Amino acid sequence: MVEVFFKNPACGNRIESVTGSYADYSLDETQLFIHDVDVTKEVIIIPAENVVKIENI
C-alpha cells in the first residue's frame, strides 16, 4: 500500500493524499499512476510535477 501526497491546483495547490495498492510512473516519468485507489479500485493519474511525497504504508 502507498499513500501519495500531491498538490491539487484546483484547490489552490492544497496538499491532498490518496491511498492505493501501488504507484508507478509513466515511461517518460511525466505522470504517476496510483492503482486500486481506496474502495473504488480505480486508477488515478497525477502529473509528476504535482507529486510531493510517496509513502509506503
Describe each model-derived feature in a short phrase.
Residues 1-11:
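A short beta-strand micro-motif
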Residues 21-23, 45-57:
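Structured surface patches comprising rigid loops and adjacent beta-strands/short helices at the edges
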Residues 7-9, 37, 49-51:
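Generic structural motif
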Residues 10-42:
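Acidic, low-complexity, intrinsically disordered interaction modules
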